[in-house]
From Swiss-Prot:
Key word Flavoprotein present: yes
Signal peptide: none
Record-listed FAD binding positions: G9, G10, G11, H12, A13, G14
UniProt protein name: tRNA uridine 5-carboxymethylaminomethyl modification enzyme MnmG
Oligomeric form and interacting partners: Homodimer. Heterotetramer of two MnmE and two MnmG subunits.
Pfam families, sorted: GIDA, GIDA_C_1st, SAM_GIDA_C
Domain of life the protein comes from: Bacteria
Gene3D superfamilies per the UniProt record, alphabetical: FAD/NAD(P)-binding domain (3.50.50.60), GidA associated domain, C-terminal subdomain (1.10.150.570), tRNA uridine 5-carboxymethylaminomethyl modification enzyme MnmG/GidA (1.10.10.1800)
Cell location: Cytoplasm
Similarity comment text for this entry: Belongs to the MnmG family.
Gene Ontology biological process: tRNA methylation; tRNA wobble uridine modification
Organism this protein belongs to: Borrelia garinii subsp. bavariensis (strain ATCC BAA-2496 / DSM 23469 / PBi) (Borreliella bavariensis)
Function of the molecule: NAD-binding protein involved in the addition of a carboxymethylaminomethyl (cmnm) group at the wobble position (U34) of certain tRNAs, forming tRNA-cmnm(5)s(2)U34.
PANTHER family named among the record's database cross-references: GLUCOSE INHIBITED DIVISION PROTEIN A (PTHR11806), PROTEIN MTO1 HOMOLOG, MITOCHONDRIAL (PTHR11806:SF0)
Length: 621
């Protein structure tokens, strides 16, 4: 059977890729090992968080689905870092895991141009030169032809789980791993490796003594992840906080020899910023305790997730150290924690549009690329789906820059630097994070989604109204001046005769203070928050914009794909090797490759500025 596009895998990357392709009118097939586990939240029951929440809103602004699914399935909402600056604040929501999964599958099933099929892909169909994708072959012998394939295998490609001495060829507990494609990829010359991740035990709610824990409530004001949603009024469940203690650490230390992490059996690197409890005990010996969050997994389940206690120790040891924690003395484990090791492709093998350098038409996204997390996977899946569609249309790739989005930072880091450990997004990875606030995701990206055809007229019109209203209120602030009769408190006295716009720049004055004086400035909370942040941080934002403009000049110097850098005289040996391997798309990407010197960038610029080298510069220095 023939399709325009095939997506391998039904996780968060696969969902976004399949929806993007089908919504852009391409006949798409998603093949996954189990249709009942589409969109499964394999580890923590939450979406969003620092930088991750920003990415979810960026996905939504571009026309992706993750924001709408979490808005539908959330059971608690919080803004993290609320006491800090807006650049590092981020929305996070606990999810009802089953509700999230069900909604994801339902969305796929109801999508036009999209078919779902349960099977395991074991090989590719390729052209005679073995450098162009033509389709896939499944375990049961089915052959499906297509001109593009998006590969999103998650933790299932040669996945292996570890619980003490127990080993099983699985990508998740009780779910078999996938074999076949690993051999195909190796035979095609892909640089591959092993990575490791893990998950904690789940326990029964009835066995927890919540009186010994700290309760953590959600925020009363819920900010929807999707810009298409208005106010959300949701019932919320509480989370709880407890801590490990000296006895917990002793139990783990005494049994460290039983951990496959420290016996040498696991060769893959684990996530640096989401370590197992064994790692924490070894690496942070000076800490007397570690914080543990007890999180509900949904409205209709009694299972609780122990955030911060990921472990692959034997089940009896897990039971022992969990019972040493206050509030969990009688905790009953329903599912043990475990580690999972899996194959990944070094993302340096990919162009910035997430297409393979070795096989035309093969796009790769998610944990297969060495990333970690639902949000990182969904972001890559969306971009891979969009670029696969553009490949089918013979159009230029759509590549987001580092200055435009966290998604741009994520993909640029992966394809430029590669990775030897699961890559997780943080606000600190973005050089211009004040310009990447979660509330401005639509301002930055929705026009791109609209032009692509993923954002409909209704959503785009709603955004244009919001944009217009924000500017109208800013103009009103500039026109309105403070008179002496308006002053009701001492804070405002020094601002008499100034316009409201400049008064609002005072850190001690809020927009609410000014609305009390002039109620005509009032509007929805979303619009007022954006106005206030734009005005208060205008100076910083403008300085960043000036810097971004200069940096974007380097982005405008496009470099050819599949270029032989050995012919350029004056490049260092290291630069020749790294440019040949990475094949940077722009001079800016070339400058970010580790180990590259400014002199190498100058040599490149001079070489490609020469008209005889057939590279057109899109700006004047």
């Amino acid at each position: 059977m023939d399709f325009d596009a095939i997506v391998i895998g039904g996780g968060h990357a696969g969902i976004e890729a399949a929806l993007a392709l089908s919504r852009l009118d391409f006949k798409t097939l998603m093949i996954t090992q189990n249709l009942d586990t589409i969109g499964k939240l394999s580890c923590n029951p939450a979406i969003g968080g620092l930088a991750k929440g920003n990415m979810v809103r960026e996905i939504d602004a571009l026309g992706g689905e993750m924001g709408r699914i979490i808005d539908f399935s959330m059971i608690q909402f919080r803004v993290l870092n609320k006491s800090r600056g807006p650049a590092v604040q981020a929305p996070r929501a606990q999810a009802d895991k089953l509700m999230y999964q069900t909604k994801a599958k339902e969305t796929l099933e109801r999508q036009d141009n999209l078919d779902l099929f349960q099977d395991t892909v074991v090989d590719f169909l390729l052209n005679s030169m073995r450098n162009e994708i033509k389709g896939v072959v499944t375990e049961r012998g089915n052959k499906f032809r297509s001109n593009v394939v998006v590969l999103t295998t998650g933790t299932f490609l040669r996945g292996k789980i570890f619980i003490g001495e127990y080993r099983a060829n699985m990508g998740r507990l009780a779910e078999f791993s996938a074999y076949g494609l690993d051999k195909t990829l190796l035979s095609l010359g892909f640089e591959m490796g092993r990575l490791k991740t893990g998950t904690p035990a789940r326990i029964h709610k009835k066995s927890v003594d919540f009186s010994k824990t700290e309760v953590q409530f959600g925020d009363s004001d819920i900010i929807p992840f999707s810009f298409s949603n208005g106010n959300l009024d949701k019932s919320q469940l509480s989370c709880y906080v407890t801590y490990t203690n000296k006895r917990t650490h002793e139990i783990i230390s005494e049994n460290m020899h039983l951990s496959p992490l420290y016996s040498g059996e696991i060769v893959g690197n684990g996530p640096r910023y989401c370590p197992s409890i064994e790692d924490k005990i070894v690496k942070f010996k000076d800490k007397d305790r570690h914080q543990i969050f007890i999180e509900p997994e949904g409205f209709n389940t009694e299972e609780m997730y122990l955030n911060g206690l990921s472990s692959s120790l034997p089940e009896n040891i897990q039971q022992k150290f969990i019972n040493s924690i206050e509030g969990l003395e009688h905790a009953i484990i329903t599912r043990p924690g475990y580690a999972v090791e899996y194959d990944y492709i070094n993302p340096i093998e990919l162009y910035p549009n997430l297409e393979s350098k070795r096989v035309k038409g093969l796009f790769v996204a998610g944990q297969t690329n060495g990333s970690s997390g639902y949000e990182e996977a969904a972001a890559q899946g969306l971009m891979a789906g969009i670029n696969a569609a553009l490949r089918l249309q013979n159009k230029k790739p759509m590549i987001l820059t580092r200055t435009s989005s966290y998604i741009g930072v994520l993909i640029d880091d992966l394809v430029t630097k590669g990775t030897k450990e699961p890559y997780r997004m943080f606000t600190s990875r973005a050089e211009h994070r004040l310009n990447l606030r979660h509330d401005t995701s639509d301002k930055r990206l929705i026009k791109i989604g609209y032009d692509l055809g993923l954002v409909d007229e209704e959503r785009y019109s709603k955004y244009l109204f919001k944009k217009r209203r924000v500017e109208e209120i800013k103009e009103l602030l500039k026109q309105r001046r403070l008179s002496l009769k308006d002053v009701a408190d001492e804070q405002l006295k020094k601002h008499v005769s100034k316009d409201f716009y400049h008064i609002l720049k005072d850190p001690s004055i809020s927009l609410d203070n000014l609305i009390k004086i002039d109620p005509s400035l009032s509007d929805s909370k979303v619009i007022l928050e954006q106005v206030e942040l734009d005005v208060k941080y205008e100076g910083y934002i403008n300085r960043q914009k000036d810097l971004i403009k200069k940096l974007n000049n380097l982005e405008l110097v496009k470099l050819p794909f599949d270029f032989n850098y050995e012919i350029i005289e004056g490049l260092s040996r290291e630069a020749r090797e790294k440019f040949s391997k990475v094949q940077p798309a722009t001079l800016a990407q070339a400058s970010r490759i580790p180990g590259i010197r400014n002199t190498d960038i100058t040599v490149l610029f001079i070489y490609f500025s020469n008209p005889k080298n057939k590279v057109v510069l899109n700006f004047s220095l």
